[in-house]
Amino acid sequence: MQSDNGNAIGPYQIWEIYWKDAVEFNPSLRKNHTYEDCTNKEYAEQIVLAYWQRYATEKRIGRPVTKEDRARIHNGGPNGYKKKATLKYWKKVQKEL
């Protein structure tokens, strides 16, 4: 599955720069894998978790991390939790929770 104008792949719509951030944080995720493996749901979930472990932290945000923070970081990058542009995505996620 490819979307976001062809820039993102897989069930979690992961961009290559997102993948690079995650595997830089957790190099074990790069072993025997490439970006294209983000089309695999289980691998993509590991990438998302590593990305959150890197950016969705209480130390970084300055308060306990919420589901909203995680969703908005996933959608808008490391500072996505601050961006107005990610609120629409959060509303979509809320409907699925």
Language model region names:
Residues 12-14:
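Short glycine- and hydrophobic/aromatic-rich loop-to-beta-strand nucleating segment
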Residues 16-82, 90-97:
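Alpha-helical segment that forms one wall of the substrate-binding/catalytic cleft
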Residues 85:
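Short acidic-hydrophobic sequence patches enriched in Asp/Glu that either
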